């Protein structure tokens, strides 16, 4: 759709023509403010606007008033809730999982003209300015501005960084952002639901990060995002597998929009003076999270939506996969060679080829190619390998479970008579020619139990240790679901799906872990997630890191990616891999929380003899670093930190780092600078202080750039601080089964440190 000259209407998906039978309602100054059960309730009148491009009140339409509930929680959280529907504010739902520290703070009012909202601990958390704006009147050329709710919030009590509602306009009739508003359908049947909006003021130099696995540059200011999960189809476009309705601002606050609806977020884009949020449902539920550091804010977000669970030790080892292995013999040959040639590895993953028919997911092994699945899994276990299996949440036409699923309504049901239109996989990375009859309905408890105990448990009982919960970004949108509309379910479906798989895996296999692609708020509780179908190229490598950094700034601790990218180019399935990309992606993978080789053609390193020795050395380094990785992971599960950390987490006042998306901290000690080009060169920025190259021992001073450094193919720039202590494992192993972490040693980066030999 072409952009109009009225950006507010563009943002609100609004057409002022009468034919649409929709109206914008703008919030006015509060008509009433009161204390109620520890909350502050602000009655906000809304005035309907005329159907014209120059906004003006429709004085013939009576105002409608709705309550804005302001609630505070320890620590440093303010909640804003208003609904034009019949929704009720709740502290318990699928997205929310409050930590014990999150306790309500009673609020009370002080003052009248300038009304302060003060917490029981004495902190001023908001101001409602009811004073009359000052004027020096000399002209009647333009109408006077409409009344405005002037409300400013201070979630951590710091009045120097107030978050104010934004009434942003060029002239009184020409609005760019509304502080609060909604769109009504005027009682006319429409395909579009009612929509509600809220806006906050932002500064000219303000930066924004987060919003999910965003394959974009680090600073997201000047961009608008449609928060609707969809198959990303790679990592170099606007689509997104994992949208998270949360952002973090360089002014040191975060905003979490508690919704599963389709929504839009404009970060100083439609208006450069405003952050604007649009929810395609007539309810707004916003948590403003304060803090002194990004880690404080991210921890506050996790305190609302849940902390990640700790994955098992073996999951931090190397995973080997391909799309796909087709037989037990093929898999066992690969596992034998990994052991024979001393490539350390913990997990073998079977993708789409373990079924009776490739891609026809029936949760059962092909009896011809896997004649003894129990013996197959046992033999791999004896060799130190865990088994991971691919599946997806749709029941295909022809699947043996279809009739049972339809009869018992375990899958979504067509909303109209006739053959259902499959919108769950259309235009996506599902490369099968199958038709899907329905989406497993996780809003229905009986369907969830059927999935957990009828489909997954028999596999887990055999000894399978991980389920790849692929897809889940899309559902059948033309179907009916037990306890939700498809519009409200689509985004949160990933959470319900992954929770079910995670819970039964932990219950039966003993280890809580999945391998998931989609995501929404709360999914970080059920690790782990990987970055989807990246291109095996320099662009795919760079895009993957960007996505991982933003996901870590959206509450996720654990994240992986396909090494060395998922698909080939230009021939998706058949073009050979670039060996330099293979090495550089391997080096990057060693310094991420989890490391899986996967893709459309052969990924085993011996197929690339020119680089196999380099790859093996980096694999061995990965296992030597596991004590450090486990230590940092345990800390991440209790804090706000991810494993892959944007530099801004540690240096929020350094303006440079809000623009750096090709370097990162791995845990709290390593500064990692992947090489992402065939020239084997890169620029490096080192934050202030002294730094030591972990591989060579070279000392460098920070607070500056180092330009055009040459990096040999077998090296990657990795830096640590002087006096850092790095836990390492002193022995080579074949898998984590061979490790006794009590034998770990501590490497101190002192004056005698000359680097770690690969």
Label the predicted regions.
Residues 502-507, 511-513, 519-530, 540-543, ...:
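Catalytic core of carbohydrate-active enzymes
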């Amino acid at each position: 759709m072409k952009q109009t000259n009225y950006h507010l209407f563009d943002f609100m998906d609004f057409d002022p023509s009468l034919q649409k039978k929709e109206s914008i309602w703008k919030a006015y100054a509060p008509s009433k403010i009161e204390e109620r059960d520890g909350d502050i309730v602000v009655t906000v009148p809304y005035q309907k606007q005329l159907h014209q491009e120059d906004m003006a009140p429709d004085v013939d339409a009576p105002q409608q008033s709705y309550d804005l509930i302001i609630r505070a929680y320890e620590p440093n959280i303010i909640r804003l809730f208003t609904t034009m529907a019949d929704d009720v504010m709740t502290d318990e739902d699928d997205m929310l999982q409050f930590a014990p520290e999150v306790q309500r703070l009673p609020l009370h009012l002080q003052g009248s003209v300038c009304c302060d909202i003060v917490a029981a601990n004495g902190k001023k958390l908001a101001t409602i300015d009811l004073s009359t704006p000052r004027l020096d009147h000399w002209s009647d050329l333009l109408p006077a501005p409409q009344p405005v709710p002037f409300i400013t919030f201070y979630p951590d009590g710091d009045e120097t960084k107030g978050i104010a509602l934004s009434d942003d306009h060029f002239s009184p009739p020409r609005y760019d952002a509304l502080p609060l508003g909604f769109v009504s359908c005027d009682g006319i049947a429409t395909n579009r639901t009612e929509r509600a909006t809220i806006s906050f003021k932002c500064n000219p130099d303000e930066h924004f990060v987060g919003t999910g696995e965003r394959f974009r540059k680090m600073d997201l200011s000047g961009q608008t995002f449609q928060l609707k999960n969809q198959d990303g189809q790679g990592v170099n476009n606007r689509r997104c597998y994992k949208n998270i309705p949360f952002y973090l601002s360089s002014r040191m606050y975060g905003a979490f929009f508690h919704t599963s609806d389709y929504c839009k977020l404009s970060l100083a884009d439609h208006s450069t003076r405003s952050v604007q949020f649009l929810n395609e449902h007539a309810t707004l539920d916003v948590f403003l999270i304060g803090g002194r550091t990004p880690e404080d804010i991210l921890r506050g977000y996790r305190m609302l939506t849940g902390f990640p669970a700790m994955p098992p030790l073996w999951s931090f080892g190397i995973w080997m996969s391909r799309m796909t292995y087709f037989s037990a013999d093929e898999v066992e040959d690969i596992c034998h060679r990994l052991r024979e040639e001393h490539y350390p590895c913990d997990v073998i993953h079977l993708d789409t080829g373990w079924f009776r028919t490739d891609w026809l997911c029936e949760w059962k092994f092909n009896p011809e190619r896997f004649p003894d699945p129990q013996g197959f899994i046992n033999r791999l276990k004896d060799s130190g390998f865990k088994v991971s299996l691919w599946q997806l949440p749709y029941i295909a036409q022809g699947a043996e479970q279809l009739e049972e699923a339809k009869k018992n309504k375990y899958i979504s049901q067509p909303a109209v008579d006739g053959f259902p239109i499959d919108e769950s996989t259309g235009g996506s990375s599902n490369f099968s020619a199958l038709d899907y009859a329905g989406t497993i309905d996780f809003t229905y408890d009986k369907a969830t139990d059927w999935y957990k105990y009828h489909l997954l448990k028999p596999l887990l009982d055999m000894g399978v240790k991980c389920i790849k919960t692929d897809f889940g970004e899309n559902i059948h949108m033309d179907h009916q679901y037990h306890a939700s509309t498809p519009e409200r379910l689509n985004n949160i479906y990933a959470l319900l799906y992954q929770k079910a798989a995670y819970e039964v895996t932990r219950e039966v296999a003993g280890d809580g872990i999945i391998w998931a692609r989609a995501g929404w708020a709360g999914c970080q509780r059920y690790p782990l997630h990987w970055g989807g179908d990246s291109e095996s190229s320099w662009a795919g490598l760079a895009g993957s890191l960007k996505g991982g950094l933003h996901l870590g700034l959206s509450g996720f601790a654990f994240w992986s990616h396909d090494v060395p990218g998922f698909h080939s180019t230009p021939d998706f399935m058949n073009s050979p891999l670039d060996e330099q990309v293979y090495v550089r992606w391997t080096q990057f993978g060693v310094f991420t929380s989890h490391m899986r080789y996967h893709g459309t053609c052969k990924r085993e390193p011996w197929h690339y003899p020119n680089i196999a020795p380099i790859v093996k050395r980096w694999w061995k380094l990965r296992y030597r670093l596991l004590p450090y990785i486990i230590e940092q992971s345990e800390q991440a599960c209790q804090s706000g930190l991810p494993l892959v950390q944007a530099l801004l987490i540690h240096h929020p006042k350094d303006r440079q780092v809000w623009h750096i998306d090709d370097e990162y901290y791995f845990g709290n000690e390593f500064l990692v600078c992947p090489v992402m080009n065939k020239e084997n060169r890169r620029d490096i920025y080192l934050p202030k202080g002294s730094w030591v190259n972990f591989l060579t021992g070279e000392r460098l001073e920070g607070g500056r750039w180092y330009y055009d450094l040459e990096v040999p193919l077998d090296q990657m720039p990795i830096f640590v601080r002087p006096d850092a202590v790095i836990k390492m494992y002193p022995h080579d192993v074949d898998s984590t089964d061979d490790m006794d972490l009590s034998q770990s040693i501590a490497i101190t980066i002192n004056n005698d440190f000359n680097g770690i030999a690969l």
